[in-house]
């Protein structure tokens, strides 16, 4: 509601749609007073039931615009491209308003400029009269046009000017515009005559400090991160965005599904009431009139979760009268040009590969990204890219919507002493029976990235699955790789890319190179490229090569991607094995898929002395292995009567706080529909007593029916743990948990990284050698849950700098690991406290010891926090059979404190 100088001007509804007020008759010369009242709730609120914070206030820009009394009040640009996509025409419909009462004559001019400001064409029309009128200026026979696409977002400038009878310019403005065609043929969508896959995300206006008043810097941060992650489509769920964001999407290159501010959510039958027709039409019409000049807008969406009523039939007709773009509405396919669904399973997608409701199939929401999520994304896109009628989809959603606790923020407090953000969720506000129908608990936090826009393991997976380049058929002997260009328009050329490679030996970088010049690979084609790799490969180590397509400053008029990515940024990549033991007929396996698990060679101790003792009897019995290594450092390992390791020291320093035992603790948001039991202990027993044989010693311990561990002790202090798990029920994880002593903070690992990854979310995480700290391995979700897994572990090195001791772990067989200072038992309970409580990371106690998991397998993440798949069968922990890995521990003095990062 608006007043000027105390006089009422007008009122508007729709919190996320622009409103204009003519205040000409209310202003006076000099200072004026503008007053605004924002109603938090009104009847329009029933059409704004989106999954978001419902906050009060003005959260977008307010402008004051002055015009002549006779002025161009609207302009509508349309164009068409010929089949060659480089020639066509443009029409600009101008609406002229005359507020002067008397007749006037004006010259209207439209000028088309290219990116460099060169005039391409111009045209004029004359307005004469005193009534509102429309005039159309046509620019025909345009040639040598540069078409717009998300891959190459070339923008022209359309300048509109108005001159008086004497030729003096009275007003002028410009609009950025791109030439592109949108066509539907069969059950596919084409941009400029090319089939396009819409690789998208749903978005919200959210900022952890400013709430819904998102600033330009954050908008640009979001969009550049999306581009870097190969996202090409944005659904403005579930309301139009600020105009500035559309300008950014035009310039950076995105396909946009522009969605009206209409969502009934819990009250979807509202739309069946014809009394809402005018309100629905108003919201959709205002969106279309504002945004129809943006080339990035490909689809109009009539709203979300508002039922199937005929209200949207009328809204569709209104939209078609204003613009001819394709229309989407998931609630009723008869009002939509697209078939659409939310949260299908992979099998559902597979069964609709030729289309949905006999229309192009667009999955408007899928892969619900709440918490530790985005499992089996690859399987979705295997189906989509192998289809004849699926055009893509949008992940729900881009960013977690939590904000800083307002009570702490006003005191300048954003982080706890342990470095966790003071983020809150719907659970922190007046819930009823654990459910808040205004803020829906944690259902505002479904983001791929965190509220402060931190890159996550989820986003790494999206980047990999969404990438437009496929590397395959790597020949380890010839050092050649097949590169398939899956872009719709963009050639892979040395004009704008370089092909880089990095060779690693057991995770350490041994060779780094690039190709600056290579044969151009046009969109839709493939070529084989040979890399000048010089590294000699043998069977003494694992050799891997990372191949990357890197962005560089363009030449010869190529599209400039350095506007959103730094030079050298890898926009697409793959990893292959160079090792002979992983090679068959010269063709190496890519590490995107099934890996060869490492094999530990037999071990011979390089010196040292070992002794074993058994003391006490019955429940007081202890088993001790002690000795000195080849450097004269003493070690001791003690087991209690049941075989539980109770002490392990090296050079007088404690290595453990608790010995290994079976541990099945695992809980993430996607597990809410998965029922399992948790345990971190078993009924252990010594089945084969501690015995020395030659220079070595052995002991066998049974952990009830869960597992058996065969220990082998070597004189130099090395310990092998060969663990065989016996699975008899479906669990969330199968593995051992243990606690390392305080001080083992520095971490080096040779596994998939650098960010967390899981069995069904690891294609975007490559094998490498990474350094970090235990504290930095936390995935800071809004609510605590299992985190930090790293698949395909080869080696782990923990360093206690203060004590000057280091503990190395090498792996034989399949294994993953995670490390933490936090006890998972705090959120992995038999109840539902993880989801129905105010538990935050900053509420948890950081313990000094290091909680470690060594898993044979952890259940895949799936995407079942809302619809979708709980976990595909390939990633479910087996419920029967025996499974083995070996962990080889070796303590030593901490001489390798400064560890290479590659």
PLM region spans:
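Aromatic-lined ligand-binding clefts that engage carbohydrates, nucleic acids, or primary amines
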Residues: 1-5, 34-36, 106-109, 490-492, ...
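Beta-strand-rich ligand-recognition modules
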Residues: 3-33, 37-51, 130-149, 213
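Extended substrate-binding grooves/exosites of carbohydrate-active enzymes
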Residues: 7, 12, 19, 43-46, ...
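An acidic-aromatic loop/edge-strand motif
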Residues: 15, 23-90, 98-100, 173-179, ...
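Extended acidic/polar, glycine-enriched regions
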Residues: 28-31, 93-183, 546-551, 562, ...
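Solvent-exposed, conformationally flexible loop/turn segments
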Residues: 29, 87, 128-134, 518-526, ...
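Beta-strand/loop-rich accessory regions of lumenal/periplasmic or secreted enzymes
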Residues: 40, 149, 532-540, 555, ...
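Carbohydrate-binding surfaces of carbohydrate-active enzymes
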Residues: 94, 99, 384-638, 721
């Amino acid at each position: 509601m608006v007043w000027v100088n105390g006089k009422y001007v007008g009122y508007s509804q729709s919190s996320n749609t622009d409103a204009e007020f003519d205040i000409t008759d209310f202003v006076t010369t000099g200072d004026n007073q503008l007053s605004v009242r924002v109603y938090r709730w009104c009847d329009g609120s029933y059409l704004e039931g989106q999954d978001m914070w419902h906050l009060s206030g003005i959260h977008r820009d307010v402008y004051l615009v002055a015009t002549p009394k006779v002025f161009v009040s609207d302009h509508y640009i349309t164009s068409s491209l010929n089949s060659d996509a480089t020639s066509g025409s443009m029409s600009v419909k101008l609406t002229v308003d005359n507020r002067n009462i008397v007749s006037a004559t004006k010259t209207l001019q439209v000028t088309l400029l290219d990116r460099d400001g060169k005039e391409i064409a111009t045209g004029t029309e004359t307005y004469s009269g005193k009534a509102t009128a429309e005039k159309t200026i046509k620019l025909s026979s345009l040639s040598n046009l540069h078409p717009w696409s998300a891959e190459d977002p070339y923008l022209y400038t359309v300048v509109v000017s108005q001159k008086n009878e004497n030729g003096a310019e009275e007003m002028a403005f410009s609009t950025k515009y791109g030439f592109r065609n949108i066509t539907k043929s069969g059950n596919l969508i084409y941009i400029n005559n090319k089939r396009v896959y819409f690789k998208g995300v749903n978005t919200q206006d959210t900022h952890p400090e400013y709430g819904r008043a998102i600033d330009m810097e954050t908008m640009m941060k979001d969009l550049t991160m999306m581009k870097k992650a190969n996202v090409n489509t944005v659904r403005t769920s579930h309301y139009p965005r600020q105009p500035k964001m559309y300008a950014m999407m035009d310039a950076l290159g995105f396909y946009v599904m522009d969605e009206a501010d209409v969502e009934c959510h819990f009250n979807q039958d509202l739309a069946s009431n014809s009394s809402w027709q005018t309100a629905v039409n108003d919201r959709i019409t205002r969106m279309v009139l504002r945004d129809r000049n943006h080339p990035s807008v490909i689809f109009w969406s009539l709203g979300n979760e508002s039922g199937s009523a005929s209200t949207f039939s009328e809204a569709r007709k209104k939209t078609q009268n204003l613009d001819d773009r394709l229309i989407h509405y998931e609630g009723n396919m008869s009002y939509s040009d697209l078939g659409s669904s939310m949260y299908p399973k992979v099998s559902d997608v597979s069964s609709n590969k030729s289309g949905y409701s006999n229309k192009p199939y667009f999955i408007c929401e899928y892969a619900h990204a709440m918490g530790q999520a985005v499992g089996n994304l690859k399987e979705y896109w295997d189906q989509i890219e192998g289809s004849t009628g699926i055009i893509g989809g949008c992940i729900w959603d881009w960013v977690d919507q939590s904000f800083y606790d307002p009570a702490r923020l006003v005191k300048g407090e954003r982080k706890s002493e342990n470095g966790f953000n003071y983020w809150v969720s719907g659970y922190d506000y007046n819930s009823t029976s654990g459910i808040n129908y205004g803020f829906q608990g944690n259902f505002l936090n479904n983001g791929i990235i965190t509220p402060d826009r931190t890159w996550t393991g989820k986003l790494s997976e999206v980047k990999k699955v969404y990438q437009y380049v496929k590397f395959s058929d790597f020949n380890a002997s010839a050092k050649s790789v097949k590169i398939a260009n899956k872009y719709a328009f963009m050639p892979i050329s040395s004009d704008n890319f370089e092909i880089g490679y990095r060779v690693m030996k057991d995770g350490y970088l041994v060779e780094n190179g690039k190709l600056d010049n290579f044969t151009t690979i046009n969109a839709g084609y493939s070529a084989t490229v040979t890399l000048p790799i010089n590294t000699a490969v043998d069977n003494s180590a694992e050799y891997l090569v990372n191949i990357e397509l890197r962005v560089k400053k363009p030449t010869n008029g190529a599209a400039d991607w350095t506007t959103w990515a730094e030079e050298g940024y890898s926009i697409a990549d793959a990893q292959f094995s160079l090792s002979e033991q992983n090679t068959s007929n010269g063709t190496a396996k890519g590490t995107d898929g099934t890996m060869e698990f490492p094999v530990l060679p037999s071990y011979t101790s390089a010196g040292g002395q070992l002794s074993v003792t058994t003391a006490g009897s019955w429940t007081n019995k202890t088993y001790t292995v002690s000795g000195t290594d080849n450097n004269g450092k003493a070690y001791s390992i003690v087991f209690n009567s049941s075989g539980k390791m109770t002490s392990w020291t090296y050079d007088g320093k404690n290595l453990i706080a608790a010995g290994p035992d079976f541990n099945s603790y695992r809980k993430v948001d996607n597990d809410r529909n998965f029922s399992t039991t948790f345990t971190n202990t078993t009924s252990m027993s010594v089945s084969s007593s501690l015995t020395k044989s030659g220079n070595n010693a052995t002991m066998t311990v049974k952990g009830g029916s869960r597992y058996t561990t065969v220990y082998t002790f070597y004189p130099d202090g090395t310990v092998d743990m060969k663990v065989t798990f016996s699975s008899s029920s479906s669990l969330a994880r199968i593995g051992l948990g243990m606690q390392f002593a305080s001080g083992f903070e520095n971490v080096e690992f040779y596994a998939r990284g650098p960010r967390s990854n899981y069995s069904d979310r690891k294609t975007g995480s490559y094998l490498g050698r990474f350094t970090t700290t235990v504290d930095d391995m936390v995935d800071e979700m809004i609510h605590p849950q299992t985190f930090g897994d790293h698949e395909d572990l080869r080696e782990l090195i923990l360093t206690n700098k203060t004590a000057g001791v280091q503990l190395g772990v090498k792996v034989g067989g399949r294994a993953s690991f995670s490390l933490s200072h936090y006890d998972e038992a705090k959120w992995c309970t038999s109840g539902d406290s993880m989801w129905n409580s105010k538990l935050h990371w900053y509420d948890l106690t950081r313990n000094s010891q290091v909680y470690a998991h060594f898993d044979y397998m952890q259940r895949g993440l799936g995407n079942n926090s809302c619809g979708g798949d709980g976990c595909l069968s390939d990633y479910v922990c087996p419920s029967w059979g025996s499974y083995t890995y070996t962990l080889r521990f070796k303590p030593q003095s901490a001489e390798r404190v400064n560890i290479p990062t590659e």
